[in-house]
Amino acid sequence: MKFKLKGIIKLSKEVPGIEDDLEKFFTEAESDILRRGVPEGQEHEAAHIKSWRLEGDTLHIEMESGRRVRAHDGLLRLKKPLGQLLGPKYRVGVRGISVTDYTMEMKAPGVSGIPSLAELPFVEDAAITDGTIMVRFQPLEESDLRKHVFDRVVKHARTLVESSDDLTVQVTRATPGEIIARSRSRDFFFEGDPTEEAMRLGWVKKFPGRGQWFYGPKITALHRALEEFFIERIVKPLGFVECLFPKLIPLDIMNKMRYLEGLPEGMYYCSAPSRDPETFEEFKNELIINREVPMDLLKRGIKDPGYVIAPAQCEPFYQFLSHEVVSAEDLPVKFFDRSGWTYRWEAGGSKGLDRVHEFQRVELVWLAEPGETEEIRDRTVELSHDAADELELEWYTEVGDDPFYLEGRKVEERGIEFPDVPKYEMRLSLPGREKGVAVVSANVHGTHFIEGFSIREARNLNIWTGCTGIGLSRWIYGFLAQKGFETGNWPDFIGERVEGVENPRIITWPRQD
């Protein structure tokens, strides 16, 4: 690393004739003040004063350094001794210091771009040229330097560089994307777009919110049939017990999960209204008169976000166990939840029924000793394979390349145990498309949530957590993509649950082109 700084030392007044004393002070500082704590042989990494000049009551200084006594730390070190020199002799004090221009250079071989680096606080600009990152900082006041904001930016920059070697690759002993199991080929009975056909038939209707749909009686009957089928084939055989998980998750829980560091842009944030009747009275009056929602008034009546709507569905399980002590003899703890929607903001990523903002899942979560944690995860995958075969669907399972819980852990931290394979992802093949739709995400977290939520075993034995999400909304999409909408092409035990279910008769819907 290399740091180049242009700074200002502001004196309390202009004092002529102090240049000789300043020259002597800076020369001695090179071998004393700026060398303290620097290991022998690494003096070249310490801060050096490249030039200085006095203009009135302002001392302009340029410094360079390596990673030992960074240039801004060197500037801070100069302030007090300089005041002790000038005060008694010239009756002048040092009012403050600031940095007008600061750049950092860092070697990053193989890294071609880190867009988020330029978006960090206090960063003016960032670029990568010939394997070297150049970061230019905004002007910094003394208070910024003393709060170590610069050091935190540097640390985060290093983290971003190191994370370019994906942590998933670092911790996974298998190759992400490697297919580990595949079904036999199946006949497909549909060639169109399932979303378009479902709309044409009136099985779904687009809802005004982005990535949202109204699911009508037919597709809901299919949903319930598949849900009950998976519970009978996967959930009950493994001994999971049903619970009702909250879906409004406090930000503190998401912070413990490291979700806010990893994917803050992928969640819906929620705010509670303030207890201010006057604000809402004004809001109601303007709404009545203008017939438009006065967003400025609404914002005034809403508190800062305090929650997110559940983006992972498993969040309450870790909070339920937080600061609790369990005994290995009583493990595993196995819960499942199917009580409602999961929400993710996909921005421009939402398309049809296969990628929505609001979707249904059966979520399995468990706590066990490491070996059993992996065994449970593997059994959920095996039983999912069996279920897909019984449904006469074509599928494949691969090593996951994006375990959700690794998003916020950009560099591997000491003391956190990771499984050999953090995630398996099962996909249903889609006619005419190379990549199938993901329907099962089976994860082992190691001690990620054990550490984050302070969960402990009574004798300090190792315990891990795991979760498997059975994505009902995507199972339906994959099922319809392969089987089509004619129930005669479906397995009888599914088709009979949907036959006889009809949409209400509405003159204008579904629209017939």
From Swiss-Prot:
One of its GO terms (cellular component) is cytoplasm. GO terms for biological process: selenocysteine biosynthetic process; seryl-tRNA aminoacylation. It catalyses: tRNA(Ser) + L-serine + ATP = L-seryl-tRNA(Ser) + AMP + diphosphate + H(+); tRNA(Sec) + L-serine + ATP = L-seryl-tRNA(Sec) + AMP + diphosphate + H(+). It holds the Pfam family tRNA_bind_4. Pathway: Aminoacyl-tRNA biosynthesis; selenocysteinyl-tRNA(Sec) biosynthesis; L-seryl-tRNA(Sec) from L-serine and tRNA(Sec): step 1/1. GO terms for molecular function: ATP binding; serine-tRNA ligase activity; zinc ion binding. Its EC number is 6.1.1.11. Its main location: cytoplasm. Gene3D superfamilies: 3.30.70.1920, Bira Bifunctional Protein, Domain 2. Keywords: Aminoacyl-tRNA synthetase, ATP-binding, Cytoplasm, Ligase, Metal-binding, Nucleotide-binding, Protein biosynthesis, Zinc. ATP binds at residues 344-346, 355-356, 474. Signal peptide: none annotated. Its cofactor is Zn(2+). It comes from the Archaea. Zn(2+) binds at residues 314, 363, 467. InterPro entries: aa-tRNA-synt_IIb, aa-tRNA-synth_II/BPL/LPL, Ser-tRNA-ligase_2_arc, SerS_tRNA-bd. The keyword Iron-sulfur does not apply. Binds 1 Zn(2+) ion per subunit. This ion is coordinated with 2 cysteines, 1 glutamate and a water molecule that dissociates from the zinc ion to allow the coordination of the amino group of the serine substrate, which is essential for catalysis. It is found in: Cytoplasm. Catalyzes the attachment of serine to tRNA(Ser). Is also able to aminoacylate tRNA(Sec) with serine, to form the misacylated tRNA L-seryl-tRNA(Sec), which will be further converted into selenocysteinyl-tRNA(Sec). Homodimer. Consists of two distinct domains, a catalytic core and a N-terminal extension that is presumably involved in tRNA binding. Belongs to the class-II aminoacyl-tRNA synthetase family. Type-2 seryl-tRNA synthetase subfamily. This is Type-2 serine--tRNA ligase. It comes from Methanothermobacter thermautotrophicus (strain ATCC 29096 / DSM 1053 / JCM 10044 / NBRC 100330 / Delta H).
